[in-house]
From Swiss-Prot:
The keyword Phosphoprotein does not apply. It comes from Dickeya zeae (strain Ech586) (Dickeya dadantii (strain Ech586)). This is Ribose 1,5-bisphosphate phosphokinase PhnN. GO terms for molecular function: ATP binding; ribose 1,5-bisphosphate phosphokinase activity. It holds the Pfam family AAA_18. One of its GO terms (biological process) is organic phosphonate metabolic process. Signal peptide: none annotated. The gene is phnN. Keywords: ATP-binding, Nucleotide-binding, Transferase. SUPFAM superfamilies: P-loop containing nucleoside triphosphate hydrolases. Its EC number is 2.7.4.23.
Length: 188
């Protein structure tokens, strides 16, 4: 059974870096889905498909999103194409939302594999400063939000990203292999 890997983590935890690295590795039945966002493509951050508010609303009205939500003054969507990819037996990883995990759980049930990317507060603060998108007040708010969102669903698989990217990639692939093995043992 193919899974929807719902990757979440605080802003600055390294989700975009991990997703970019996954796009560069040989796809072993794993696709990385782009999000549709009402944010300009050149705004920095993740590799996404930029839509106007009108385009987003049109797609939503025509059921072209498997999931969609609003956060940080933008609209976010996961295209309905992920359902086709899952039906074809491919695992799909998406940049999910901690606040909208329940919405994904309701739609995908046992096919949902939540993975929570975690970093220490010190590493998170350092990364937020290095990327230069937020001022100190905004960084303080992001750190506060990360701390408040640290209560994760019981089903969430934790993935530490304090170390080098290669280490996180290896841990991610190990986690997926273990989850696939556990699934087949339970299903037999």
């Amino acid at each position: 059974m193919a899974r929807l890997i719902w990757l979440t983590g605080a802003s600055g935890s390294g989700k975009d870096t991990l997703l970019d690295a996954l796009r560069q590795t040989e796809p072993v039945r794993l696709l990385v889905a782009h999000r549709y966002i009402t944010r300009p493509a050149q705004a920095g951050g993740e590799n996404h498909i930029a839509l106007s508010e009108a385009e987003f609303a049109y797609r939503r009205e025509h059921n072209l999103f498997a999931l969609h939500w609003q956060a940080h003054q933008y609209q976010y969507g996961i295209g309905i194409e992920v359902d086709h990819w899952l039906s074809a037996g491919l695992d799909v990883v998406v940049n999910g939302s901690r606040s909208h995990h329940q919405q994904a759980q309701q739609r995908y049930g046992s096919r949902l594999l939540p993975v929570c990317l975690q970093v220490s507060a010190a590493v998170l603060a350092q990364r937020l400063r290095q990327r230069g998108r937020e001022d100190e007040a905004q960084i303080a708010l992001r750190l506060q939000r990360a701390d408040a969102m640290d209560i994760l669903p019981a089903t969430c698989r934790r993935l530490n990203n304090d170390g080098p990217l290669a280490q996180t990639l290896q841990a991610f692939h190990t986690l997926l292999a273990a989850e696939k093995s556990d699934f087949w043992q339970i299903s037999l």
